[in-house]
Structure formats: C-alpha cells, structure tokens
C-alpha cells in the first residue's frame, strides 16, 4: 500500500482530524504492511506486543492459550477491524497476553508498539479510540465466558455454528471438528461425540 492509500485509509478514523501534521507523518512513516497466509501465528508466546494491527482483509482469531495447551477463542476480527490486544503491553489496563492467528490469508497494517505508544501519549483522541475499540471486543469475550459456564457443549457448538454462519453470511460452513473444539475451548473428541447425537 503506498503512502497515499495509507493516508486515505487513516483519514476515515475519528482520531485523524485531531492529530498534528507531525504525528500524522510519524504514523505514516512507521506503518508497515504485512501479509500472513492462513494458519500463520501472528502473535504468540515468542512474539508478543507487536503493536496495533489494522486488518485490511481476512479473518484473525484472538485467543488465550493455557500452560496445558488448551485454547479459548476470545473473538474473531474481520475485514476493516482493528486488533488492539496485539499492543496489550502498551495498554496499562490489560494484564494478560493473547495469541493471534490468521484463519484466512490476511493483509494488514502494523503500527509497531513503540511508535504506537508515542502517538497514544500525544493524542487523547487516539487513546480514547483504542480503549473504546478494546472495550467493544470485551462484549465478545463476556459472551464467550457465558457460553462456557452456562451452556451445555451441544448448545455451545450450536451457538458457535450460528455465529459463524452469520459472520460469513453463508449457511454452508467448512470447519473441522478440531477447529470447532479450539474455538469453543473443548476437546475434539467431545465435539465429535456431541455432533454424532
């Protein structure tokens, strides 16, 4: 993406009009364009606190990983969404690390953590925008927690499949039992048994 395309992209955000010319140029000078193929780990235990990810195209999965290797999906991001938890080390209220994988081929822009931190300190509008986006995603996290604690496995699978159909706009889904299990925080064998009922 060339500089003019980046400029057009960022002008759509409400914080842009409140940035100084110096900060705008600083943002554009530090933005990096990235591409990840489906299945790639974008942020993991080895690679934490990348910065803020602006998803141009694709689907990202944001999840927690236990010491035992169990995964719990927090939420998914789709075209034109922003991943703020990829910069969790710069957000003082966030005290946990997340994993981020590309579920499909993804094109995104990265504002690395250090430039992101400087811009957040300089601009209350950007800071407010980032915290607002973060809190919006927490409604998805709470919904996931509610499902885990208050729904049966069969209900969780059904809710997940309905959400996926709504998100993709299709009644046909191509998912493995392993992918369903990872997404709902269960074991593949348990999902398999439940689907056979």
Question: Residue ranges of each PLM-predicted region?
Answer:
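His/acidic/aromatic-lined binding-pocket segments of jelly-roll/cupin-type domains
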Residues: 33-34, 43, 50-56, 73-75, ...
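Short, Lys/Arg-enriched, Trp-marked, Pro/Gly-tolerant hinge/linker segments that flank
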Residues: 141-153, 169
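Phosphate-/nucleic-acid-contacting segments
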Residues: 153, 162-197
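Glycine- and acidic-residue-biased ligand/ion/polar-headgroup-sensing regions
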Residues: 39, 50-63, 78-80
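Cyclic nucleotide-binding regulatory module and flanking cytosolic helices
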Residues: 1-37, 82, 87-91
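Short phosphate-coordinating micro-motif centered on Lys-Gly-acidic
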Residues: 42-47, 89
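Cyclic-nucleotide recognition modules
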Residues: 73-132
């Amino acid at each position: 993406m060339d500089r003019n395309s980046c400029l057009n992209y960022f002008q759509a955000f409400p914080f842009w009009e409140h940035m100084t010319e110096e900060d705008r140029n600083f943002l554009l000078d530090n933005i990096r364009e990235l591409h990840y193929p489906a299945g790639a780990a974008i942020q993991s235990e080895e690679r934490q606190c990348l910065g803020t990810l602006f998803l141009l195209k694709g689907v990202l999965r944001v999840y927690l990983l236990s010491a035992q290797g169990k995964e719990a999906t927090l939420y998914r991001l789709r075209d034109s969404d922003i991943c703020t938890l990829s910069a969790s080390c710069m957000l003082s209220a966030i005290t946990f690390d997340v994993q981020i994988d590309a579920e499909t081929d993804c094109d995104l822009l990265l504002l690395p953590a250090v430039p992101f931190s400087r811009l957040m300190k300089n601009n209350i509008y950007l800071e407010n925008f980032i915290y607002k986006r973060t809190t919006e995603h927490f409604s998805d996290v709470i919904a996931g927690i509610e499902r885990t604690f208050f729904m049966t496995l069969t209900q969780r699978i059904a809710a997940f499949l309905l959400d996926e159909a709504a998100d993709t706009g299709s009644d046909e889904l191509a998912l493995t039992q392993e992918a369903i299990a990872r997404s709902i925080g269960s074991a593949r064998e348990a999902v398999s048994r439940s689907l056979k009922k």
